């Protein structure tokens, strides 16, 4: 492959690309040497991609030398395994090297196969490239666009105008959606839930560190759900609801947002409300978990089996028919009138 920079890949590199796309490798590290693209390191998969991520990638990152890293996920699309493309360009590397790697990046991706690359990360420090940095990147991707100065001023005005007397079911102004990162253990638990190795995952916000963390994964039946709802703190709950409906046995993922109202601080309520949609977006779009129903409650007593069933399968309201006007009698309308009016009586007497 020849490019604008004149960089070429050997046949050996192209063959390794092909084997990597077929799933043989977990990682390929690519360097540019003597105007050729070379593979300087490779690793084969032995565990899950998350377990191997930091151990495989971070030791390969040099403080003064750019590189590319292709890292294979365990998920697949129509073309095969999905990959993360990492462009490492440390701050202290030579400017010419930075420019060379930046100019060659697009063509390297094209040669490997853009359809296989799910995410692309650019980093100048190791924290950008670490697994935690990758999760932050995913969270930022699902976060709303930043506000302009005018929009930010308007938001602050609306927040100040909003009464602080807020109940769970009250419609109130909240902050713009905030996408806090999800810790590794929480993300892994959600993956296990998606694969039905767990049936319940509870998450909470670590407000001090601004991260969403795992709170509970206790095996849970429908009758146990009320016990899982804290009475003094907000939580996010994901439940695998196994049930029968119209003769079919179904497994449905249900999201429950519990907020016990005045026992939580205003800040906690606002943060849980603001983080909810970005979290759900990340789970539905990144983990590809289809959530059948999203429920908001203020206490666990509401979570009866009948309530949950009717939330997942709401009753269809029958069509209300308009009142039908009664039909008149068949044939002639009523008995013939026998009483004559005054004018008719005078005519008859004449």
Curated annotation (Swiss-Prot):
Annotated GO MF terms: actin filament binding; actin monomer binding
Keywords, ordered alphabetically: Actin-binding, Cytoplasm, Cytoskeleton, Repeat
Domain ADF-H: 4-139, 177-313
SUPFAM superfamilies given in the database record: Actin depolymerizing proteins (SSF55753)
Superkingdom field: Eukaryota
GO terms for biological process, alphabetical: actin filament depolymerization; barbed-end actin filament capping; positive regulation of neuron projection development; regulation of lamellipodium assembly
CC terms in the record's Gene Ontology section: actin filament; cytoplasm; myofibril
Ranges for region Disordered: 316-350
Record bears the keyword Cytoplasm: yes
Cell compartments where the protein resides: Cytoplasm, Cytoskeleton
DNA damage as UniProt keyword: no
Pfam families associated with the record: Cofilin_ADF (PF00241)
Protein family membership: Belongs to the actin-binding proteins ADF family. Twinfilin subfamily.
PANTHER family given in the database record: TWINFILIN, TWINFILIN-1
Free-text function comment from the UniProt entry: Actin-binding protein involved in motile and morphological processes. Inhibits actin polymerization, likely by sequestering G-actin.
Subunit structure: Interacts with G-actin; ADP-actin form.
Record protein name field: Twinfilin-1
